[in-house]
């Protein structure tokens, strides 16, 4: 069977978690991150830098990478201009916890209103296949 014909996962369908105030959380994702949709925050995949759109599922032995986030998970969102996005978040009163640049991209972290850690990632080049 050719890879094209093989059943495969095609992307991240969603992130689902329990919060105390769903409407306030949805408003934060809409007003602060610019994500909105009929059924909640939504984003459409696009091909950037000539690569195939993708999401990564990572498993960690402990929660050190996710801290100070709560709930044992983190959401990674790709952005096209991390510096500009950080400036926009800062103007809206969002605290940026940290930012770094690695060989494969630039990263910054914030917490949503429920304490969920959000990792913002600007990819610097197409990933290796």
PLM regions: where:
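Core segments of cupin and vicinal oxygen chelate
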Residues: 6-10, 16-56, 91
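Vicinal oxygen chelate
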Residues: 1-11, 17, 40, 86-129
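Short amphipathic alpha-helices within nucleic acid-binding modules
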Residues: 28, 83-88
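Eukaryotic phosphotyrosine signaling hubs
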Residues: 12-13, 70-74
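Short, well-ordered beta-strand elements within core beta-sheets of diverse protein domains
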Residues: 17, 75-77
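Conserved short beta-strand elements that form part of the metal-binding/catalytic scaffold
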Residues: 33-71, 110-113, 117-125
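Short alpha-helical
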Residues: 23-24, 83-84, 105
